[in-house]
Structure formats: structure tokens, C-alpha cells
Amino acid sequence: MRQGFPKARAGEVIGLFGGSFDPAHQGHAHITREALKRFGLDRVWWLVSPGNPLKPQGPAPLDTRMARAKAIMQHPRVIITDVETRLGTRYTAATLDQLSALYPGVHFVWLMGADNLAQFHKWQRWRDIASTTPLGVLARPGDRIPARMSPAAAVFGRARIPGRASQLLGRAAAPAWCFVNVPMVEQSSSAIRSKGGWV
């Protein structure tokens, strides 16, 4: 394995939680712990991205966001990584293509909040992502109905695993996705930035 890349063995189930984490907060940590419990994951990797192509303004410097993420999410089964920067990828589909090639036999699950599912159809190659990687969707307050009514939910409706069977997601063949309602921590990166509590 290349220097600076997380380690994983064939057969492991790794949840991938990507984002700019600008900044990371307790809400991110909470849904990560919930994902570990709900989706049959061995570990979760936080993929701290170099930037978000869907956001017009760039994030704080990567090293600042990485340090904050490591301070917020301290768990023995969670790794904070800048693997997208190391791979030179900017879009989720390209990241997943490269990770699948680098980690043969590892089962990846893409984790997202319900707000991301609601706009998932705007992502580059979103159908490819959903066709090749199981999706674990964690509901946030106010985002449940838009997510369930989203174009992605309609296109992949038959691939949905019921919430009561969420533990099956990690070993499911794609396309597969599961939507779970979890008690949420009311915190957001944009609210932290707007209050001046961040870089």
C-alpha cells in the first residue's frame, strides 16, 4: 500500500464519509458512530476533500480541516484521511474507482446525510456511484421527505434495503441503499462558519 494511505484487508467493510468538513463538528461524529452501528461496518474513513465541486467558495486550508477533524472524531474504528488529495481526485466517482482498484476485496459503503441524497442526482456520474457502491443514508432533521422524494431514490427505489435490515448493507451487492432515521445532533458547518467560529 502506498505511503499515507489507510490500511484495509480484503473482506473488510469500510464506510466512506466524504466531505469538506469545513469545519468538522459533533454532528459528523454522531452520524459516524450511528453508521458504524447501523450498517455493519468494520471501520469508517473520513475523506476530507480538497474542495467541494458543488460549493462556489473554497474551504479552509486542508491541514486546518484535517486537524479539526482529528480533534472532533476520536474513535478506534475511524480514520481521518486526505486520500482524495493523495489520489488527485475531485469527484466521488473517480475516488471510488481508484479506491476499488487499490483495495481489491474491500467492501466500500458510501455514507451520506439525507440532504446529500436529495441532491445526489447533481453529482458527477451519480448513477455509476449508486450502481457500484452501496449507499448508507442517515436522516437529518428536516431532510427526510426531500431525500425520499429525490430523483436518486426514485431511480434506485427497488435497490432500497429497509431500515430494519440495515446491518445487511455492508455486504450487499450494489445497487443497494438504506435510509435510516437516527436521533441527530443539531449542528452544521455552515452555521459554525456564519457565527464566526471557524477560519
From Swiss-Prot:
It is an enzyme of class 2 (transferase). Its EC number is 2.7.7.18. GO terms for biological process: NAD biosynthetic process. Pfam families: CTP_transf_like (PF01467). Gene3D superfamilies: HUPs. GO terms for molecular function: ATP binding; nicotinate-nucleotide adenylyltransferase activity. Keywords: ATP-binding, NAD, Nucleotide-binding, Nucleotidyltransferase, Pyridine nucleotide biosynthesis, Transferase. Belongs to the NadD family. NCBIfam families: cyt_tran_rel, nicotinate (nicotinamide) nucleotide adenylyltransferase, PRK00071.2-2, PRK00071.2-4. This is Probable nicotinate-nucleotide adenylyltransferase. It comes from Roseobacter denitrificans (strain ATCC 33942 / OCh 114).
